């Protein structure tokens, strides 16, 4: 069960395109772990986060111990997991668990605006940047920089790089990348 859940969440985490979680209401246990598998988390002001598993006699099983510590630091992750206490959206933003908190009525509009902003950029470059961040976090700083340099170099073999640089030099605002 835990292995299958982790496989699903890793697929989300390593999916080529950025994944944005829109959290409205409770994200506890697996729900919190699902949100942490996403690249960006936007929460409604009524959202509640937590890893309550130890109160049930189990540990987080879908990457919660690993992702939470990477997102908020080991000390806060241990406090949240060991106490099994839930936190509100504002606290989640303060500790870095979520990127942004908005009014519930504005949640989907905010997430869609963010997604459209990402989609305006070169898809290949965004995917390479995501890969560099994710893989770089699995190694030391020198290894991470080597990954970044590799992904950066690959961009120069794309039509989007040539087009993007040309648009910059010619001050073109409305770019239409080809994903090539």
Residue positions per predicted region:
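Terminal low-complexity tails and localization/encapsulation signals of metabolic enzymes
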Residues: 166-180
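Well-ordered beta-strand positions
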Residues: 40, 79, 83-85, 91, ...
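Active-site-proximal glycine-rich helix-loop-beta segment
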Residues: 31-41, 45-46, 88-91, 95-97
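Hydrophobic, secondary-structure "cap" segments at the distal end of domains
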Residues: 66-75
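C-terminal long alpha-helix characteristic of the crotonase
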Residues: 42-47, 98-146, 150-159, 176-180
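Terminal peptide-recognition signature
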Residues: 18, 35, 68, 92, ...
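A structural preference for short, pocket-lining loop segments at secondary-structure junctions
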Residues: 11-21, 40, 44-48, 125
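An acidic, glycine-rich surface segment that forms the CoA-thioester-binding/catalytic face
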Residues: 1-24, 71
